């Protein structure tokens, strides 16, 4: 299958410039293309993964990727479809974020092998040395204010106000495309659908300043079956950095994907063939309660992002927590699996009677409730049911001398640290 058709079949093409010309270019030989990543945090998140994996698919098809990290544009801020001005960051902060993002991209693109090995570029390399006068004379004169204000991403900000700094962002992104075309013969840009206005600023600059044709592919902004923006868990971004979102948390995110989205996400976020995904779809629809599509999705993406060992660890944590086998997990694994649950500091030398402890830590509201929970068998210490009202936590209950896990009922976990 032609790479363009495969991208379409996987639901990865939202919009393109001249499709016929783009198809022809991809058929005739190796195309150099780029995707830009502005450092707005110290990590990329799941929302970035759609463009990253699309870039990788094109590389596997023989085309050459350039990964542009916006050391300059990250200092300015993209106004596209944002309600308010971004907070400006210091150069030291942005430089640190650039390094982090460059490291993450190397997990997905091949920067070492073959004539189409990926190349990392930073747009601070050309913007850092250009003077304001040169910027206006050599770049700005190719953009009319009318053209710039016609962009949907700008229109939405006109009423509330947009600074010249952010207004000029589209010119900077357009110039990125121009520089990469002149220096590396890059003729295609890939980005999110919210970037269409900025990306076509690049094709316009190429046409007017160099009389060349540039191509654009936008990938869709992914939403779930309810229309909710994809890539957040409990309102928080799902990061690619394991320190910010653990492999276990990412595993759980994919396991909790709705049935209506699971097969579609397999096409977007995995490298399984379309035939393999079709087989999974049939099995999944025959027995949706077994959650095969979610299990495969979690396995493939966690392995892709964090490696096979991290996936196995996340799976083991899931299975042991589900079975209540707390003692089968290390403290490191427990911290990963129970991140975000209520955590209480306990004095090691206190007389930690189970009833007193349940109340003082806030796990229950009263001694009466605590006694009822214990007597009814609803309280577990490190996976062991406790029904003795006189039970006192001892050193033996301190896992690796660091924490104790309390469970109330089937699912409510609490961590006591010493």
UniProtKB/Swiss-Prot annotation:
Binding site for L-tyrosine: 34, 169, 173
SMART domains with a match to the protein in the record: S4
Catalytic reactions on record: tRNA(Tyr) + L-tyrosine + ATP = L-tyrosyl-tRNA(Tyr) + AMP + diphosphate + H(+)
GO CC annotation, single: cytosol
Protein's GO biological process: tyrosyl-tRNA aminoacylation
Signal peptide boundaries: none
SUPFAM superfamilies reported in the protein's UniProt record: Alpha-L RNA-binding motif, Nucleotidylyl transferase
Residues noted as binding ATP in the record, renumbered to the chain: 232
Highest rank taxon of the organism: Bacteria
Molecular function terms, GO-annotated: ATP binding; RNA binding; tyrosine-tRNA ligase activity
Main location: cytoplasm
Keyword Transferase in annotation: no
Motif ('KMSKS' region): 229-233
PANTHER family: TYROSINE--TRNA LIGASE, MITOCHONDRIAL, TYROSYL-TRNA SYNTHETASE
Record text on subunit structure and interactions: Homodimer.
Function description: Catalyzes the attachment of tyrosine to tRNA(Tyr) in a two-step reaction: tyrosine is first activated by ATP to form Tyr-AMP and then transferred to the acceptor end of tRNA(Tyr).
Family per record: Belongs to the class-I aminoacyl-tRNA synthetase family. TyrS type 1 subfamily.
Official protein name in the record: Tyrosine--tRNA ligase
């Amino acid at each position: 299958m032609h790479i363009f058709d495969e991208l379409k079949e996987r639901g990865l093409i939202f919009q393109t410039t001249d499709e016929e010309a783009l198809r022809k270019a991809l058929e005739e030989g190796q195309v150099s293309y780029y995707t830009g990543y502005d450092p707005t945090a110290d990590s990329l998140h799941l929302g970035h993964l759609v463009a990253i994996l699309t870039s990788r698919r094109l590389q596997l098809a023989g085309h050459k990727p350039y990964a542009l990290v916006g050391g300059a544009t990250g200092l300015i801020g993209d106004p596209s479809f944002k309600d308010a001005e971004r907070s400006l960051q210091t150069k030291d902060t942005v430089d640190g974020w650039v390094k982090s993002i460059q490291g993450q991209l190397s997990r997905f693109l091949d920067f070492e092998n073959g004539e189409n090995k990926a190349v990392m570029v930073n747009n601070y390399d050309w913007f850092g040395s250009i003077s304001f006068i040169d910027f206006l004379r050599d770049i700005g004169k190719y953009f009319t204010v009318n053209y710039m204000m016609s962009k949907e991403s700008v229109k939405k900000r006109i009423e509330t106000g947009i600074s010249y700094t952010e207004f000029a962002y589209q010119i900077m992104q357009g110039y990125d495309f121009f520089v990469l075309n002149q220096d590396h013969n890059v003729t295609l840009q890939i980005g999110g659908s919210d970037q269409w206005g900025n990306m076509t600023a690049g094709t316009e600059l190429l046409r007017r300043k160099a009389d060349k044709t540039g191509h654009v592919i936008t990938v869709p902004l992914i939403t779930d079956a309810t229309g909710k923006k994809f890539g957040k868990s409990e309102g928080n971004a799902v990061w690619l950095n394991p320190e910010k979102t653990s492999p276990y948390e990412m595993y759980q995110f994919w396991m909790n994907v709705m049935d209506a989205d699971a097969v579609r996400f397999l096409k977007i976020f995995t490298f399984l063939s379309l035939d393999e995904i079709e087989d999974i779809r049939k099995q999944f629809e025959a027995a949706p309660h077994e959650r095969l599509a979610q299990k495969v999705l979690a396995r493939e993406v966690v392995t892709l992002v964090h490696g096979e060992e991290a996936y196995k660890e996340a799976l083991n944590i899931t299975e042991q927590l589900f079975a209540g086998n707390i003692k089968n997990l290390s403290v490191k694994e427990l911290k990963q699996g129970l991140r975000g649950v209520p955590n209480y500091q306990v004095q090691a030398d206190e007389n930690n009677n189970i009833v007193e402890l349940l109340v003082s830590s806030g796990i229950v509201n009263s001694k009466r409730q605590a006694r009822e929970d214990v007597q009814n068998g609803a309280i577990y210490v490190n996976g062991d049911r406790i029904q003795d009202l006189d039970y006192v936590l001892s050193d033996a209950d301190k896992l690796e001398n660091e924490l104790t896990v309390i469970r109330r009922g089937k699912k409510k976990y609490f961590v006591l640290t010493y």
